[in-house]
Regions:
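Eukaryotic protein kinase
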Residues: 1-285
Length: 286
């Protein structure tokens, strides 16, 4: 999670520096590790994710984390709607990765605080997130964990964070027991059946669930125990009753069970009613 309003005070056990950066506060934590707000000497603010000690001790995790970070460093920059990876140390006792700090709430918190997004905003969001997926996929990455809390709403458009990094957890000693890696309500059917078969179209399914949440204000596959939610995804038991009619065709196309039947990111941009130029214009601050 990011945003100045979400910065928490450091605990006694938290680091005061990470690599060359001064740590200013806590931004959150998750299955991968802790996230801190840090600052470079020149004043640039960063979100630094520090891997949990138990993951750092796993050789498989380290190798995959190293590979995924290198790939992630090639993604980003102007117009990609992704948070750029600025620095990383994959050989540290606890590996870390620093991305540009994005000022703004995540999509999950925004919907919880203010309710479903307006139709025009959802169309812009759909096109921008499709552009982000195109940039990620072009580098040979699959996000694997696209969800509302991994989408930050900056004044000049959304930013997708944590792309590809969840793959480092797959197949490690901590997940070899068949535990599904990712946020269950946004996983594609093929991720549930066999995580090794994840393809770029898997992210498109997750995007469909994200857009259903953004436009309808509720989890499309409901809540409850993980096993129950996963079964709903596998059986196509989705509740889109809160999604406005004009958004339904796009959402339903993304949520098709067959990955090959889902639209590509480029098709999604067009389906959302935008070209690259109109998207830039629509997301211009002010």
């Amino acid at each position: 999670m990011q945003g100045e309003h979400g910065v928490q005070e450091l605990r006694e056990t938290d680091p005061r520096t990470i690599g060359p950066y001064q740590v200013l506060g806590r931004l959150g934590s998750g299955g991968m590790g802790e996230v801190y707000l840090a600052e470079a000497r020149g004043g640039l603010r960063l979100a630094v994710k520090v891997v949990r000690a138990e993951h750092a001790e796993d050789r498989t995790f380290r190798a995959r984390f190293r590979h995924e970070v290198r790939a992630a460093q090639t993604v980003g920059g102007a117009g990609t709607y992704t948070a750029r990876v600025v620095d990383a140390d994959t050989e540290a006792a606890r590996p870390w990765m620093a991305t540009e700090f994005v000022q703004g709430p995540n999509l999950r918190d925004a919907v919880l605080d203010r309710g479903p997004l307006p139709a025009d905003t959802v169309r812009l969001l759909a096109a921008a997130l499709a552009e982000a997926l195109a940039a990620i996929h072009a580098k040979g990455l699959v996000h694997r964990d696209l969800k509302p809390s991994n989408i930050l709403l900056a004044p000049d458009g959304p930013r997708v964070i944590d792309f590809g990094i969840v793959r480092a957890l797959e197949g490690t000693a901590l997940t070899r027991t068949g535990v599904v890696v990712g946020s269950v309500g946004y996983l594609s059917p093929e991720q549930i059946r066999n995580g090794a078969q994840v393809v770029p179209a898997s992210d498109v399914f997750s995007l469909g669930a994200v857009l259903a949440y953004a436009s309808g204000g509720r989890e499309p596959f409901g809540e409850g125990q993980d096993s129950v939610v996963l079964l709903r995804i596998l059986t196509g038991d989705v509740d889109l009753s809160a999604v406005p009619k004009e958004q339904l065709p796009l959402v339903e196309a993304c949520l098709r069970d067959d990955p090959a039947a889902r639209p590509t990111p480029a098709e999604l941009v067009a389906a959302a009613g935008h070209s690259e130029a109109s998207l830039r214009e629509g997301l211009r601050p002010g």
